[in-house]
Amino acid sequence: MSSVPYNSQLPISNHLEYDEDEKKSRGSKLGLKYKMIYWRKTLCSSLARWRKLILLISLALFLFIWISDSTISRNPSTTSFQGQNSNDNKLSNTGSSINSKRYVPPYSKRSRWSFWNQDPRIVIILAANEGGGVLRWKNEQEWAIEGISIENKKAYAKRHGYALTIKDLTTSKRYSHEYREGWQKVDILRQTFREFPNAEWFWWLDLDTMIMEPSKSLEEHIFDRLETLADRELKSFNPLNLRDDIPYVDYSEEMEFLITQDCGGFNLGSFLIKNSEWSKLLLDMWWDPVLYEQKHMVWEHREQDALEALYENEPWIRSRIGFLPLRTINAFPPGACSEYSGDSRYFYSEKDHDFVVNMAGCNFGRDCWGEMQYYTTLMEKLNRKWYTRFFFP
C-alpha cells in the first residue's frame, strides 16, 4: 500500500495553464496579424482615395528639385544677362550661333555673393571685365564667356557657403604707369583683405577658368589633405630652374600661400592665400614700386616674375609657400603648353575628375569661346542628376 496520507494534496499538472497561455498567445498573434491587414487596407484605400493629390505633390517636389539643380548646372545665364538691342542675342563661331544676350556686369565696389553667410571663412575673388572696354571693344563672345564664368563661381560659392567678390579690372588712372595695369591683381588682393577682415582664406580665380567638380569643397579637396598634397621645395618640379636651396628657410612653418607651376613658371590664374600678417607683408613687398620701376622692361609677366624673384631671394617668403600639383586647381586644356603635349602633369583629365580647368592664353591662337563651350557642356554632363536624363538624354 502507498504510504502517502489520504488527505495530502496531489501534484497538479500545468498542462492546463500552458494550454491557456498558448491560446492567449495565439490570439494575440492573430490579433496583431489582423491589425496589420486592417492598417494595410486602410492605407491602400487612403492612397487610392488621395492618389491624384499625392501624385501632384510628388510631381511638384520632383520639378522643384530638378529646377533647383538646373539653375546651378544647366543655366549659366540667369539674371546677369539683359538685352541691350535686338542684334545682341546671337553669337556666331564657324557657322554656328547661340542664343545669348549681352552681359551687363553687376559690378560694384562691394559685389559679393554671401547671402546667409555674412562672415565667410573662404572668399573667392573673381577677376572680371579685363580691360573694361577701354583698351578695345569687347565682342559678344567675350561678354558671354564672362557671364558663364561668373555664374559658375556664383553657383559654387552658394553651394558651399563661401563668399564671392567680383572685381572689375577696368583700366583706371590708379594704374597710369604703362606697365602698372598688369599689377592690378596684387592691389585687388590688398583691397579684398580689407573688405573681408575676418575671412581665413582667399581663392583668386581668373575669368577664363571653369570649376568642373562643383560638389567638391575646398576643405575636402585641399585643406584636409594639404600636408600630403603640397610640395614645399622645388626639387621635384622646377621649370624655371630657380635656386632650389637658399639659407635660413624653415619649411616647418605653416603654408599660407598655395600656388601651382606650369611650363612657364608660377601660375597665378588660380591660387590661394591666407589672411595673415605674413600675407599682408608679402603683398606690400610685392606691390613695392621699386620692383616694377627697376624691372618692368625685363619682366615679361610682371607680377608673376616679381613673385618668382621674391621667392628665389627671400627665405621668409619661401618658408610659407606651398606648391600644389597643377591639375589640383589649374588644369590646362590641350592647346596650352603645347610643347609639353604628352605630359599628363599639365592637362585636364575627365577620367580623373580634375577640379578646375584654366583656359589661360586661349586668346593667343586658340578659340576661347569654343573651349568655354566645350568645358561648360562637359561640366554639366559630369554633374547632372540621374533624373535629368529623362529630359536631356
UniProtKB/Swiss-Prot annotation:
The chain crosses the membrane at residues 53-73. Residues 1-52 are cytoplasmic. Coiled coil: none annotated. It is an enzyme of class 2 (transferase). Residues 74-393 are lumenal. Keywords: Endoplasmic reticulum, Glycosyltransferase, Golgi apparatus, Membrane, Signal-anchor, Transferase, Transmembrane, Transmembrane helix. One of its GO terms (molecular function) is alpha-1,6-mannosyltransferase activity. Its EC number is 2.4.1.-. It holds the Pfam family Glyco_transf_34. It is found in: Endoplasmic reticulum membrane; Golgi apparatus, cis-Golgi network membrane. One of its GO terms (biological process) is cell budding. Component of the M-Pol II complex composed of ANP1, MNN9, MNN10, MNN11 and HOC1. This is Probable alpha-1,6-mannosyltransferase MNN10. The gene is MNN10.
